[in-house]
């Protein structure tokens, strides 16, 4: 039987923040690992289904999101009680010398560093843990309120004379909610939050969001020894979680932005995995390696979504200019974990309303039923596209002397009949010396122009597709083999090549031919080639030139 000891620098119940948000999947993991503590949590969980988006008093609600929450202090108490039942020794208000843990605990088989986003264990040896810490620019503060927001996770934006403030609010017990206030660096400075006490900050925020608080105050937990004043979010990513018999878990190893509510989830699932490996793998060193290998991918996946979310909040100036409906849609899909069709599963009525709004807003026409945004027509200057699908340029390297032939006729004809509204050609070169390979298409003579006109004419006669041509010049990448004739990318031709030019005499790759530094007269010649090719593209009937 192992002796298990926990050393906590804080008093029992001291915690950073107010409530914790879980997903149903996290609870399933907890139930499978320890049904006793999971049941106690489950008995006290607050459930909600909606997300409310509020901007300057305007409200948009969507459903089907399925959140659950619990108070951090209550969660800790449940875990304390269960740990004691299982014989774990809990030591509170116990500072540990993190500079040499193995010397301080010489008999320990494993030392678990769960000391959070400001982990001293990690910070003492950032190089060993291969740790990147990226301090993000926005500021936020953890507050609480007796206003319950009892049926929705609520996002609120208010524009003030000092800039935008916004809130992430959610209920975590029967009469209390977390109330996180966030802003950008300039708004933080404009308000003077840096010179305010925690209580003064809370009162300032209360006045801004008074209409949503139902007469309740904003609460602080300033008795906590670390405080919870305005801070920047540190994005922590460790590529190594192990040093000797010391192992990182939770925020010490990786952080996920609070806007997707997954920090505690990651920590709990780390702990479950670590306990399982220590229990089932005889060699402790291998157990730690297996733990990191199992958890690292999941953590990276969630961190990627969290990065998308935090970046969205950092770029709000862009999104707050959107129509309110579009803003709400952007908010819901910001992490890229929730797709358009996933929103349909969550709240079909809401999404269909959004689709109908989008189609009418984009076209100025009324629609009896919703249309998926992909199939809404699009107008670019005088060019009208029947939908928003585009076939991007793809070099095929199948021409001779730059001439598109029957192969290209079939290829582009099939793409045009495939349903995309806009079909791009491959990069088509403006002169023979502008080609990447001998197989590249061109548009520098009449024969090529007529061949392209045949392809464009077919697309216009038999499909709704518009045709766009991509004109280009290879520069230092020119005079190279076709991809299937070489083991290397862009390998120079052995014979039959041509002189290549570039802005400077620097090879494209270390094995490439050295280009000639282009002269002013040659620049003018290249410019004239582009002008000539553009005129030929227009004469061939192309709808668009890139």
Summary of predicted features, one role per range:
Residues 24-142, 351-358:
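Conserved N-terminal helical subregion
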């Amino acid at each position: 039987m192992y002796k298990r000891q926990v050393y906590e620098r804080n008093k029992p119940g001291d915690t950073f923040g107010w409530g914790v948000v879980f997903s149903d999947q996290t609870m399933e993991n907890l139930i499978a690992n320890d049904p006793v503590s999971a049941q106690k949590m489950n008995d006290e969980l607050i459930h909600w289904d909606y997300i409310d988006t509020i901007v300057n008093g305007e409200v948009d609600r969507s459903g089907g999101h399925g959140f659950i929450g619990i108070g951090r202090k209550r969660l800790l108490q449940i875990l304390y009680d269960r740990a004691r039942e299982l014989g774990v020794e809990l030591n509170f208000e116990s500072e540990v010398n993190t500079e040499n843990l193995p010397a301080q605990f010489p008999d320990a088989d494993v030392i678990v560093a769960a000391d959070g986003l400001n982990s001293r264990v990690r910070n003492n040896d950032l190089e060993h843990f291969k740790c990147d810490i990226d301090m993000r620019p926005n500021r936020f503060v953890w507050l609480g309120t007796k206003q319950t927001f009892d049926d929705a996770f609520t996002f609120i934006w208010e524009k003030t004379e000092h800039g935008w403030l916004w809130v992430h609010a959610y209920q975590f017990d029967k009469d209390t909610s977390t109330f996180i206030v966030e802003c950008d660096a300039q708004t933080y400075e404009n308000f003077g939050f840096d010179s305010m006490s925690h209580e003064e900050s809370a009162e300032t925020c209360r006045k801004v969001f008074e209409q949503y608080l139902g007469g309740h105050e904003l609460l602080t937990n300033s008795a906590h020894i670390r405080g919870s004043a305005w801070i920047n979010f540190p994005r922590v990513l460790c590529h190594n979680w192990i040093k000797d018999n010391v192992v990182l878990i939770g925020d010490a190893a990786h952080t996920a932005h609070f806007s997707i509510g997954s920090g505690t989830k990651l920590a709990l699932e780390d702990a479950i995995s670590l306990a399982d490996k220590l229990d089932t793998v005889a060699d402790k060193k291998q157990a730690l390696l297996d733990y990191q290998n199992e958890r690292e991918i999941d953590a990276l996946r969630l961190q990627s979504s969290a990065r998308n979310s935090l970046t969205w909040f950092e770029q709000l100036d862009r999104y707050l200019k959107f129509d309110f409906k579009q803003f709400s849609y952007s908010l819901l899909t910001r992490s890229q974990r929730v797709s358009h069709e996933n929103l349909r599963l969550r709240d079909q009525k809401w999404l269909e309303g959004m689709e109908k709004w989008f189609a009418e807003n984009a076209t100025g026409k009324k629609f009896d039923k919703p249309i998926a945004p992909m199939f809404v027509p699009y107008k670019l200057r005088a060019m009208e596209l029947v939908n928003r699908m585009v076939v991007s340029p793809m070099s095929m390297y199948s021409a001779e002397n730059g001439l598109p032939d029957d192969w290209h006729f079939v290829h582009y004809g099939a793409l045009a009949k495939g349903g995309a509204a806009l079909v791009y050609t491959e990069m088509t070169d403006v002169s023979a010396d502008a080609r990447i390979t001998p197989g590249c298409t061109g548009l520098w003579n009449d024969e090529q122009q007529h061949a392209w006109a045949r392809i464009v004419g077919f697309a216009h006669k038999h499909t709704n597709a518009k045709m766009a041509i991509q004109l280009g010049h290879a520069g230092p990448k020119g005079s190279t083999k076709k991809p299937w004739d070489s083991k290397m990318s862009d390998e120079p031709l052995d014979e039959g090549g041509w002189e290549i030019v570039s802005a400077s005499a620097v090879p494209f790759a270390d094995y490439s031919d050295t280009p000639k530094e282009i002269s002013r007269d040659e620049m003018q010649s290249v410019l004239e080639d582009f002008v000539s090719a553009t005129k030929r593209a227009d004469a061939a009937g192309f709808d668009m030139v890139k």
